[in-house]
Amino acid sequence: MWFKNCLVYRFNRDIDFNADQLEKQLEEFRFTPCGSQDKQKFGWVNAMGRHGDMMTHVSENRILICAKKEEKMLPASVIKDSLNAKVETLEAESGTPLKKKEKDSLKEDIIIDLLPRAFSRSNFTYALIMPKEGFIVVDASSYKKAEDVLALLRKTMGSLPVVPAIPEQAIETTLTEWVKSGDTPKGITMLDEAELKSIQEDGGIVRVKKQELEADEIKNHIEANKVVTKLLINWQDRIEFILAEDGSIKRLKFSDELKDENDDIPREDQAARFDADFSLLCGEFSVFLPNLFESLGGLTQPNA
């Protein structure tokens, strides 16, 4: 139970979370599979999957939830080919070209016909609610996916006063200062990967890997009006990650030392292992996230 990504939102006003009440609310929006004419379905599933029967999983008042989305796969090329063939046939029969409205109607008919036979794909997105710390952390690779989950949670609860957790100072400004000076806050270590982007609209992008970031070449890029927009960071020898200018935390990699703390639990006992790993994750995030935002200069103040 280890997150791979971290998109962090903060509460902009106090809100009480009751796990029992949330359990009932989530149940009302439980995921149901796509029917023959559904293009997609989105809802909540058991937090521990087949290893549990609760919609939530709780550790010291921190709540894990999981959303599932199922989408029917209808490639645009398949729809286009079917539409073109149908239009060709009808126009040949009538001797007159079809109007746009008629083509649009045909397209809808084709989609309705194809949906029952379409393959579907599913994906799961976890969210960690941390009331004490004031965060909701979504394990998503894009803000669009995270916002979809939060929109569903907002619909489920009736209200969800959260905003992206954004530092007072622009992240790219802070990252650039770190790389330029070689000086980072305690516990933060720059590694050997970064992205630098020109501040000019038509400027270039430089991506470096396995390269010393204190090298003159990197400093020259900064002197040439490039800013650091992504940086590979190690936090206290426990977590490695890429921090981007938009606040996204990706490629999370937890240290073997941390993950080995639960090695006394047999891997065959997946429910117990899930629970123990989740407790470790919560404990780590409760220190890591506040410390990271402090290192970045502190978060913007919520609206009064």
Swiss-Prot record:
Where is this protein primarily located? cytoplasm
Would the keyword Transmembrane turn up in this protein's UniProt record? no
Which GO cellular component terms are attached? bacterial nucleoid; cytoplasm
Please give the Pfam families that the UniProt record associates with this protein: RdgC
Q: What does the entry give for GO biological process?
A: DNA recombination; regulation of DNA recombination
User: Which keywords, in A-to-Z order, does the entry hold?
Assistant: Cytoplasm, DNA recombination
Report the domain of life of the source organism: Bacteria
Q: Which InterPro entries match?
A: RdgC
Q: Which GO terms describe its molecular function?
A: double-stranded DNA binding
UniProt-annotated location(s) = Cytoplasm, Nucleoid
What PANTHER family does UniProt report for this protein, alphabetically? RECOMBINATION-ASSOCIATED PROTEIN RDGC
Family that this chain belongs to = Belongs to the RdgC family.
NCBIfam families, sorted: PRK00321.1-3, PRK00321.1-5
Q: What does this protein do?
A: May be involved in recombination.
* Protein name (database record): Recombination-associated protein RdgC
Give the organism the record lists: Vibrio atlanticus (strain LGP32) (Vibrio splendidus (strain Mel32))
Tell me the organism's taxonomic lineage: Bacteria, Pseudomonadati, Pseudomonadota, Gammaproteobacteria, Vibrionales
User: Its gene?
Assistant: rdgC
